[in-house]
Amino acid sequence: MAGKSNKSKAKRAAQSTTTNSTTDVKSDAPAPPVAATVPATAPVTAAAAPVATAAAPVTAPDNGTLTAVDSAVPEANEVAPTIPKADESESQVENNDAQPKQGELRLYPVSVKTQSGGKMELQLNPGDSVMDIRQFLLDAPETCYFTCYELLLRNKDGETHHLEDYNEISEVADITIGGCSLEMVAALYDDRSIRAHVHRARDLLSLSTLHSSLSTTLALQYDAALNKVQNPGDKPKSDVPELECLGFMEDVPGSLKKLINSTSEEIRSVENIVFSSFNPPPSHRRLVGDLIYLDVVTLEGNKYCITGTTKTFYVNSSSGNILDPRPSKSGFEAATLIGLLQKLSSKFKKAFREVMEKKASAHPFENVQSLLPPHSWLRTYPVPDHKRDAARAEEALTISYGSELIGMQRDWNEELQSCREFPHTSPQERILRDRALYKVSSDFVDAALNGAIGVISRCIPPINPTDPECLHMYVHNNIFFSFAVDADIEQLSKKRPSNQMTEKVSSSEKVSCTEGTCDNEEHNNCNEAPLVENEQATYASANNDLKGTKLYQEADVPGLYNLAMAIIDYRGHRVVAQSVLPGILQGDKSDALLYGSVDNGKKICWNEDFHAKVLEAAKLLHIKEHSVIDASETVFKLAAPVECKGIVGSDNRHYLLDLMRVTPRDANYTGPESRFCVLRPELITSFCQAESLEKSKFKTKADEGGDDSSNVSADTSKVGDALIDGEANGASNSDQKSISDKQNTTAEDYAAGSSESSKSCDQIAFNPNVFTDFTLGGNQEEIAADEENVKKVSSYLVDVVLPKFIEDLCTLEVSPMDGQTLTEALHAHGVNVRYIGRVANGVKHLPHLWDLCLNEITVRSAKHILKDILRDIEDHDIGSAVSHFLNCFFGNYQTAGGKASANSSTAKNQKKFFGADQPITKKGQGRGKGKASSKKSFSSYMMVDSNILWSDIQEFAKAKYEFELPELSRTTAKKVSVLRNLCQKVGVSIAARKYDFSANTPFETSDILDLRPVIKHSVPVCSEAKDLVEMGKVQLAEGMLSESYTFFSEAFSILQQVTGPMHREVANCCRYLAMVLYHAGDMAGAIMQQHKELIINERCLGLDHPDTAHSYGNMALFYHGLNQTELALQNMGRALLLLGLSSGPDHPDVAATFINVAMMYQDMGKMDTALRYLQEALKKNERLLGPEHIQTAVCYHALAIAFNCMGAFKLSHQHEKKTYDILVKQLGDDDSRTRDSLNWMKTFKMRELQMTAQKQKGQAANAANTQKAIDLLKAHPDLIHAFQNAAATGRTNALNSAVLGETQPRGRGFDERAARAAAEVRKKAAAKGLLVRPQGGVPVQAMPPLSQLQNMINTATVSSEKGGENGEAKVQEKKESSENGKTENLAPAGLGAGLTSLDKKKQKAKK
């Protein structure tokens, strides 16, 4: 951080890591106590209830969607008073004598005298550091361009304290007593700080750091429109424009360009600011304080040469090629560069003010930089012009890969381990420790990313250049790099040319070296196909190593350390980046090896002190202490995998490395090719909890003596099912269910049972070395018992977890939208992706899930093949190779010889394409300059065509996932969602234009715009905040809004301090805070929190991530709750666009969103549009889920309500009858929802009878007037013909429109299928004697021509009566819907599972 000059350079290295190179900006001060956290919004008057309230309260499932459920949460009016509003917060805080809860911070006002002499005020906490204050000042518009200053603190007594950067305020003075003030005093610049000042000035002048969200733009446009309408003389818009959702859902490829937000137009304030070629200052000028020279060209066209000194910036007299350091005649100078430019140029002053106003108008989170931004697979099309930018060129040329880095490099390992040694006994100490760890780890990942690109691009030389290339290792910026090569492709390429299909090439035989795992004596010949056993860091095991490292980091055992680690996939290569182990590069590491083995168990090292530390971690990770025998028949007691390496570094710390098998091997995969198929840690946790709960239940029943033991075993699968629900808290589409939902017990009972069984849970441990080649010690019974334990948990995965996961998918308890969320759901349940083939076979009957699994298998198989292509091509062929691959994958590219077939020439092409003639250990040789290109033709990748590629994909899927890809997979893959998935997995960015997937070659080389690395890392998470969120979710599910609000607020405050606002977990907190405020009736507060979540999701997850789509959907519902329906519909349109890109139009969440859109139009009275969306939702659910699924019943019920609002009570009764039939079949007669549906049917039937009776009464009342009117008309025959012509014309047009479906224009954005569906409904209604008017009027009997005259005469009276009747029906309907909100599901209120979300939770609540 460029703040001070020389005074803070000698601080502790461990502390400097928390603030060095700080790029994350706090958007606001840490959250105040709960009472003060509720946004201070104006009271909402006449706010209509949200869509969901007509049917049911809304609760918060784990993916953040609003879902209609029954009364799991009390009504808002019952709980709203428990959450303090903004106007109550001050008095409540003053009267609260209790200590602040964890994560809550008391803020105190402190005045600041700025460097320019102005005054401002900050809200500070005694625990804030001086660096925090500097960051606050850097964010404030008044002080944002001051970077080099000292801070002085004056207390109430007049004492002055100089603040060092790493001081906490509480260490210097007590600001809680008041009367304290801060003063910014100019400090002297040095070479580093003045360059940082110039860099800061450039950033301030650019809007590139402003990431505007579409939600913000929509809100600003809506407010502007409202203000315009409120002006005198302006007429308000009478209608809300209809969305084009149904249209673009049918043209997803055409909507790609809509995803990219239009970037903010740059406001030019200066032509350029560049470092002058007079730099560096000559020695005699250095002696008088010159540090830097800048060349500036203003918008007026004036050129200035500016001198930066230790004190000021001024314009010198240089005009040509000779430096004239004297100040110019104008004498302009200032303490900052921005201040000087404001004096030099009036246009700069105006533009700078506009830039600052633009940034100030944005949401604070939009100005915050994300530490690890996601990869964007779409780029602006047409590609914007690339303009000259001297400053950009300077920054690009300062990147150093191979040369010596300027200045002192960061010692990542020392920083990381020092942060881990921070004290963490008090909550505030834990926050500071977590913050330091997060910052160091994030900086490491960023540095590893740049270093890996340099390694793969051959910009960084290896440290062992004389070794074979497959063994090359690299060190750059104190980070160790090594390659991990995937040999799954070799399995395919070697099987075909050899024609020996009986011998399988091991999928785990992959080549690479990690730090300290190479044995050069056994690698003199890299051409040998057999692989050396101790080369462990293969493509697959790198993932396992990363997972093991995370587990030991979470265990956090004092005295046991792990290296920082990241995995970078780029251009087909997988690079493993690790912090450098102290002393490893200076000597032989075998001398320091104290634990584990470097030669696969031939020699095992053991140390008592090391074993004690490892054993402590093993108890937390369910690893059993067991015996292993080495080659010398010596028995060792280990509590870790044999191949792990315990090393004491030169810093005397105990490091544990190579943690590929922290969890036991999967007993379902025991072949030699599956030695790195291990179980996931989530599964181990779930199994241990299930086992301990079963034991505790058995003990309880034994104590009661009332049950036999057979019941216990019968409950095993139920216990497992319940635990799976609890584990899948990150990917489930419904709220996390406790085991009590499955066992008919209360949450308190489960908590008590969990505490009782925690001890037995910890006692469950597994031997990680069973089913391996290592020789195990102990007797045969013990070894058999260890193997049986692993077999038991493997069987638990196949027999309990997988069936339960498939069941959750089918019932929409878990509803993944794309490949990423499917993978997250699998992992959250403890299921490895290699089981995805079994999942696919289990969901064949559901088209959307079948396609999702099918496409994920296809994309994962294609990813490995594309990576193999990228590994073997040169830099200049990347764009054409990627476009050719996409054409073969999505198009129908054929080689010049015609259609390819599985003959010998094809096999030869395949062999050449995959490089099968190259030995496995030569993979990655493309990194060598010119080595590969000399041995293969220029366009070897052009030898493949669509048939060859798909044949390889099918074979890969069969070998890797044990799944036979059907021929249909080529057709189902022609989707934007598949293209998106593939691009994200490989790191490809393409142009955002419409692609014709029916063409043979849909892609061109110019469509490939970028190739970025894909990264996996071990950045720690804040476990305390995560636990608080889980507790808050439990409270929210039980309706305890005030308590849940407290938990979520505490978690939000902690995460803000640890990670800053740009983090996924912060978004989760904002989502749940929005849910709580929504339930409490504070719509404006809910929108404020939801807006935060949306911005964070866009920045941290991506513009088109499913969570981002759900955020837009929830935002729309909140806006609708404030009667801002136009803005709500715009957000719904964005949600549908994103859902179309991520999942495609065929997904139940899309149907649920259609229902929500229909409810909005229904509340606006646009019944024709509402019916179109409801009909389309019904068709989707019937096609995707079946005609008897509960979600289909939801659609029928929504249609029944819509027809009821139109007065078509007969149609309402018919649709509700279908709802009732489905619920009876799925839930039974006794279920509350079934009874509710029956009540609705009775209500609709009663209203139909009432309407008929009212109609007959009206006809009788008007009978007497009829004759009088006829007599009148007989006296005026000319009126009869006029009335007859007018009535016949109007009626004929209306009937034709209803039958033919011509009531909507056939234009852009109009869905003809929906129109035909709506027309069909009207046609059937007309056939039954009803005319359903598109305008939502009351249906009237289709009159024969002879009765037209009487109908015309009575039009006014009958319409009046019917209008009143219909109006009463609508009011009554709304009232009853509101009254029955707890039990009657009008429609799902969000993007999710809808009616089925919390079935068992609701049943429990009713019990």
Curated annotation (Swiss-Prot):
Keywords: Cytoplasm, Repeat, TPR repeat
InterPro entries per the UniProt record, alphabetical: CLU-central, CLU_dom, CLU_N, CLU_prot, GSKIP_dom, GSKIP_dom_sf, TPR-like_helical_dom_sf, TPR_rpt
Compositional bias ranges of the Basic and acidic residues kind: 1362-1382
GO CC annotations on file: cytoplasm
Residues forming coiled coils: none
UniProt-listed PROSITE patterns: CLU (PS51823), TPR (PS50005), TPR_REGION (PS50293)
TPR repeats: 1025-1058, 1067-1100, 1109-1142, 1151-1184, 1193-1226
Polar residues composition-biased segments: 14-24, 730-747
Disordered as annotated region, ranges: 1-36, 83-103, 724-760, 1358-1407
Pfam families reported in the protein's UniProt record: CLU, CLU_N, eIF3_p135, GSKIP_dom, TPR_12
GO BP terms in the entry: chloroplast localization; mitochondrion organization
Keyword Iron carried by entry: no
Main location: cytoplasm
Outcome of gene disruption: Causes mitochondria to cluster within cells. Reduced proportion of the cellular volume devoted to chloroplasts leading to an abnormal chloroplasts distributions. Lower levels of chlorophyll, especially in plants lacking REC1, REC2, REC3 and FMT/CLU.
Signal peptide range in chain numbering: none
Ranges for domain Clu: 384-670
Keyword Flavoprotein: no
Biased composition (Basic residues): 1-12
Subcellular location per the Swiss-Prot or TrEMBL entry: Cytoplasm
Summary of the function given for this chain in its UniProt record: mRNA-binding protein involved in proper cytoplasmic distribution of mitochondria. Together with REC2, REC3 and FMT/CLU, contributes to the establishment of the cellular volume devoted to the chloroplast compartment.
Alphabetized HAMAP family for the sequence: CLU (MF_03013)
Family: Belongs to the CLU family.
Protein name (database record): Clustered mitochondria protein
Annotated source species: Arabidopsis thaliana
Gene name of this polypeptide: FMT
